[in-house]
Design a protein with these regions (language model features):
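A short, conserved, highly charged catalytic patch centered on acidic carboxylates
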Residues: 1-128, 136-173
Length: 174
């Protein structure tokens, strides 16, 4: 097709991304990630280390309700004194069943944070999931089944902006 003939590849400078420059480098290239794993590794992982109360966060967290696995959340991070699940997408507008997926991470009895560590119900936010895509950051409220826009990532230019976002999120958690 003609549009392919006229297109040009733009190399992503992934090798240049590190803990000191990730936000500056990815700000320009963030929307060009074509794989969720790229977006996670080169943006979200750094983002969560700043957003959370501790740098440690967990990936691929199995959620359980009544002894049955309900789903696997992309991440769990500590915020507001408890673990909160984070779902990562390239574009939430291409996810027709996103709300159903997010509900699987709510009202859970426990989560396997990794192979050795788990968190019980009282250490988990029960009705809240954070959602990030290459454009925006959202808060999912399971009680109202609403996905609430919090921030356009173009407005997140410094780590201080992320810390300010944390303070906006904490009162919403339930």
């Amino acid at each position: 097709p003609q549009y392919l003939k006229e297109s040009r590849a733009i190399p992503l400078p992934l090798k240049k991304i590190n803990a000191k420059n990730w936000l500056e480098v990815t700000q320009h290239y963030r929307r060009l990630f074509t794989l969720e794993i790229q977006f996670r590794r080169f943006y979200v992982d750094y983002f969560l280390k700043v957003l959370g109360e501790q740098k440690k966060f967990y990936a691929e967290c199995e959620c359980y309700r009544q002894g049955q696995r309900t789903g696997i959340a992309d991440n769990a991070m500590k915020i507001g004194g408890r673990w909160c699940f984070v779902e990562v997408k390239l574009n939430i507008h291409t996810e027709p069943h996103l709300h159903n997926q997010l509900k699987k991470y709510c009202q859970v009895e426990k989560t396997a944070l990794d192979k050795e560590r788990s968190a019980e119900q009282e250490k988990l936010w029960q009705n809240s999931v954070l959602v990030i895509d290459t454009t925006d950051f959202y808060f999912y409220d399971a009680l109202t089944d609403n996905l609430i826009f919090l921030k356009n990532l173009d407005e997140v230019c410094t780590e201080e902006d992320i810390k300010t976002l944390r303070e906006k999120i904490i009162p919403l958690l339930q």
